[in-house]
């Protein structure tokens, strides 16, 4: 079978037609498992988290190509229009994963040494269950490329970390007519949020830009429904993005101290803090064979120098790179400003070019590693 442009476009289209928000990747896992078994992958397996792996070649060096199957919720009708392929995950990040699969299949006949492992992981948009299981699988690799929308001319080498916080404020309740006597939990919750926002802006805003700043986002606020009573509970859900200078432990100390001071200022107020997810910030080295190979491949395919990016989001590279400490980078087609929107699409020409770039880069990594 020839893994040409038609195959690659059709593969991505089928992947987009299988709706796979975090926690519901089973159908896409099954599809890719069967696809891998029917193509040139020599070894195919699925782990207990639902990650799917395909292996080509053997021995060392070993290159991991890792992309995620899950998306944020929200179905988008799949269609091709004006050279664009629309669908949920077209940018983030099924195009990257499909391009990696196509690149690996097209490299199989050109490999003399080494191996490629393509990993299709679950829950990247959630709590990272997939990449954590991949680490537990004890896969032995020397280099890794992660598939996320950097844009065709760019390579991502750094991501911020994050803390997902759930903070609850509890007060005494009473008749709404006594609002002048009783504290309102919703108002207290919002006061606390403003203190968190202000301390980040005043003490942890970097002159070097948002990547180096501690940045909070209020992503949810809720309260108990009351009838004629003062609200006595308010819950804040906060996404705190961490620069490389502030790890999770330091960020927790900052927020914990602020909450303790807030408690002292508000007698009778109970404040509880819970961390629902944490990922450390990560900065990969820029002088590795992986970054060099991607830069050369981009220049050879499109005739322009690659730009190295620091991103304010968080990716599976954070968790993997922190654990394995091997050369890594993130690369993939797509305009990341379209991620998680209802106008998500991939430029088909860019997608096809990214396959060539992945292929060139992996070939360079394998050849260079074999020479050393």
Regions found by a protein language model. Give the residues of each.
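Acidic/histidine-rich catalytic neighborhood of metal-dependent amide-processing enzymes
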Residues: 98-164, 370
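Metal-dependent amide/peptide-bond hydrolase catalytic core
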Residues: 3, 21, 150, 157, ...
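N-terminal helical capping/dimerization or prosegment-like subdomains
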Residues: 1-64, 72, 233-237, 251-254, ...
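Hydrophobic/aromatic beta-strand patches that form the interior of the parallel beta-sheet core
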Residues: 63-65, 119, 143-145, 327-329
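Active-site metal-coordination/substrate-binding segment of hydrolases
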Residues: 60-120, 348
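Buried hydrophobic packing segments
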Residues: 32, 97-107, 134, 189-192, ...
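Active-site nucleophile and cofactor-binding loops and adjacent substrate-binding regions
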Residues: 45-46, 85-93, 308-312
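Fold-independent oxyanion-binding glycine-rich loops
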Residues: 48-49, 67-69, 122, 147-150, ...
């Amino acid at each position: 079978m020839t893994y040409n442009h038609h195959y690659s476009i059709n593969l991505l289209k089928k992947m987009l037609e299988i709706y796979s928000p975090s926690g519901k990747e089973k159908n896409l896992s099954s599809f890719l498992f069967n696809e891998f078994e029917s193509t040139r992958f020599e070894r195919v397996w699925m782990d207990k988290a639902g990650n799917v792996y395909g292996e080509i070649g053997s021995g060392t060096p070993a290159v991991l190509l890792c992309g995620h199957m899950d998306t944020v919720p929200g179905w988008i009708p799949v269609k091709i229009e004006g050279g664009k392929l629309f669908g949920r995950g077209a940018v983030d990040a099924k195009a990257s994963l499909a391009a990696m699969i196509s690149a690996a299949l097209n490299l199989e006949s050109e490999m003399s040494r080494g191996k490629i492992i393509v990993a299709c992981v679950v829950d990247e948009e959630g709590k990272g269950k997939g990449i954590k299981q991949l680490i537990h699988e004890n896969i032995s690799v020397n280099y890794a490329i992660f598939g996320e929308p950097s844009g065709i001319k760019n390579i991502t080498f750094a991501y911020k970390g994050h803390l997902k916080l759930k903070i609850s404020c509890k007060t005494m309740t009473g008749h709404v007519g006594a609002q002048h006597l009783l504290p309102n939990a919703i108002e207290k919750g919002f006061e606390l949020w403003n203190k968190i926002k202000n301390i980040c802006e005043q003490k942890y805003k970097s002159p070097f830009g948002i990547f180096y700043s501690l940045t909070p986002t209020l992503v949810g606020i809720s309260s108990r429904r009351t009838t004629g009573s003062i609200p006595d509970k308010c819950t804040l859900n906060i996404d705190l993005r961490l620069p490389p200078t502030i790890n999770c432990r330091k960020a927790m100390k900052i927020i914990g101290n602020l909450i303790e001071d807030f408690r002292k200022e508000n007698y009778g107020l109970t404040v509880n803090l819970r961390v629902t997810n944490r990922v450390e910030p990560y900065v990969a080295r820029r002088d590795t064979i992986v970054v060099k190979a991607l830069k050369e491949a981009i220049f050879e395919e499109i005739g322009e120098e690659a730009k190295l990016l620091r991103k304010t989001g968080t990716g599976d590279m954070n968790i993997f790179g922190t654990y394995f400490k091997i050369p890594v980078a993130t690369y993939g087609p797509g305009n990341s400003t379209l991620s998680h929107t209802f106008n998500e699409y991939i430029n088909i020409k860019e997608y096809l070019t990214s396959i060539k770039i992945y292929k060139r880069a992996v070939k360079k990594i394998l050849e260079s590693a074999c020479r050393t």
